[in-house]
Amino acid sequence: MVKISFQPAVAGIKADKADKAAASGPASASAPAAEILLTPAREERPPRHRSRKGGSVGGVCYLSMGMVVLLMGLVFASVYIYRYFFLAQLARDNFFHCGVLYEDSLSSQIRTRLELEEDVKIYLEENYERINVPVPQFGGGDPADIIHDFQRGLTAYHDISLDKCYVIELNTTIVLPPRNFWELLMNVKRGTYLPQTYIIQEEMVVTEHVRDKEALGSFIYHLCNGKDTYRLRRRSTRRRINKRGGKNCNAIRHFENTFVVETLICGVV
């Protein structure tokens, strides 16, 4: 704040004031000098403009957050579609209910045509096959669950009638690998290829009891756990079917190739 005072002029001004003072009397003698108080004007500052740099950085951050949210949404949507659509379709494509006609030269001298049905599950990533053979309509074999484990190189037969398991080395000359078997069944499903209708026979004999089932791998372990399990040794494989006669053998008919296989398990305990 600036204080400005006006003082009376020297000489003539003093004489005039003296005359006026004498005329006005003592009241005016005590009048103070005039003062004006001036408040200095505020210094005007130019308006500050916001930094464009800060604004651009904020915009980039918001854009990045939006992109992250969008990508997360796409990822979750992809996972949902994969789990509920692709995997479901893949499971359907890996499950087959199959039926094949074949000539049976064992039941009678006259060759008759029989139909063999089975349910097949092919696990491509785990590299194994699981086959369920229901009770045959016209005899000729026992119902069974079969696992071909290509990782362990083992085959396990669970004879449902006996409730016993039998394990043997995987015969890759008869059993198609999962990928090849899957392609075969897909072609059959489309009607572009039909398997041949002949049957071969393989004969096996029981050798020893298996105590450590965990050493057989998780797939066979889950199939045979809680059941008497035995090792098998392959005796012969032949195209011609021999009658079993008085042999102590159980038969399981199945197919995992372009032909039907009758597996004879002899020396059953």
From Swiss-Prot:
The GO annotation for biological process reads: negative regulation of neuron projection development; neuron differentiation; positive regulation of extrinsic apoptotic signaling pathway
What are the site positions for Cleavage? 243-244
Which of UniProt's keywords are assigned here? Cell membrane, Cleavage on pair of basic residues, Disulfide bond, Glycoprotein, Lysosome, Membrane, Phosphoprotein, Signal-anchor, Transmembrane, Transmembrane helix
Tell me the residues on which Phosphothreonine occurs.
Answer: 39
Show the GO MF annotations. Answer: amyloid-beta binding; ATP binding
Provide GO CC annotations from the record: Golgi apparatus; lysosomal membrane; lysosome; perinuclear region of cytoplasm; plasma membrane
Return the Pfam families for the record.
BRICHOS (PF04089)
TM stretches of this protein: 57-77
Q: List the disulfide bonds.
A: 165-224
Localization, per the record, is:
Lysosome membrane; Cell membrane
Concerning PTM, the database record says:
Type I membrane-bound, as well as soluble, furin has a pre-eminent role in ITM2C proteolytic processing. PCSK7 and PCSK5 may also be involved although to a lesser extent. The soluble form of PCSK7 is incapable of processing ITM2C. Fails to undergo shedding by ADAM10 and intramembrane cleavage by SPPL2B.
Q: Which residues are glycosylated?
A: 171
Task: Please state the protein's primary subcellular location.
Answer: membrane
Give the record's family classification. Belongs to the ITM2 family.
The record's annotation in PANTHER family points to: INTEGRAL MEMBRANE PROTEIN 2C, INTEGRAL TRANSMEMBRANE PROTEIN 2
Record protein name field: Integral membrane protein 2C
Starting at the broadest rank, the lineage of the source organism is: Eukaryota, Metazoa, Chordata, Craniata, Vertebrata
The protein's gene is named Itm2c
